[in-house]
């Protein structure tokens, strides 16, 4: 239109805009059913490749659920262990477990980059289209930051506990490693079960004793993930309320994005117009333009009275 010189706020996602325009208050009186899961795979010691390696067990943990489904039969010491004959049956059981439990939130530790992605790829390899409730639809990939490949399930919030800890809580942690073992030890006072060898090496020993221990190891990973998710959820929910963004999105943002979203939300609530995100050309020009820094007065060392702080 000739009468329109410029369009503002065109790049604000529709869902976010709708939440703010309709003054929707997110997650009030929210008491979600959380389901944590963890997978174990075969590999040659390198990072598992879904084109080659298989999923051999999946564990699930929640307040009222402890379960390990494994593709090997043996004398079981625990009622929570279920044996299936193949990976295809394992993946079908994954679908059945989620649909029966009907979680509000499903969580894994590094599930964006590993568990969810691996399950989706192996389901495709086995020619299985997962139908997950409440909409009986398959998982879908979304665009994420860096190399992350967030997986969405319609009607269920996928919370990657590791991603949120990495993006938000890591600077406050003493540990230099964000492995599940180290983070759980610092935040929960609990550690993973020691197998003595790497999981894919432990899988080679099919004795009853070892397979029971392998199942315990797999289940504990899910339990630790569940407990961590419970611990971080109140913080994540507050960020959702501050920014007006759904939990799936807000838990995958770093502080810079969170602050930006809070400013956008505040501006819209104050009926202020928000400029569009700058183009690449504008960003290059801004970086090329240098501004003189402010004068910083260096005080003489000593003891002073009547100090004013701005």
What are these regions (language model features)?
Residues 11-20, 26-43, 139-145, 269-288:
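Extended, Lys/Arg-enriched charged tracts that mediate electrostatic binding to polyanionic substrates
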Residues 13-105, 120, 296-301:
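Conserved RNase H-like, two-metal-ion catalytic cores of nucleic-acid enzymes
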Residues 29-31, 54, 100-106, 152-154, ...:
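Short, well-ordered loop/turn elements at secondary-structure boundaries
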Residues 43-45, 113-116, 166, 235-236, ...:
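Flexible loop/turn segments at secondary-structure boundaries
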Residues 67-70, 76-85, 102, 116, ...:
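Active-site-proximal helix-loop-helix substrate-binding element of RNase H-like nuclease domains
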Residues 103-111, 241:
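Short glycine-rich phosphate-binding loop at a beta-alpha junction
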Residues 201-310:
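Common nucleic-acid-contacting/processivity interface regions adjacent to the catalytic cores
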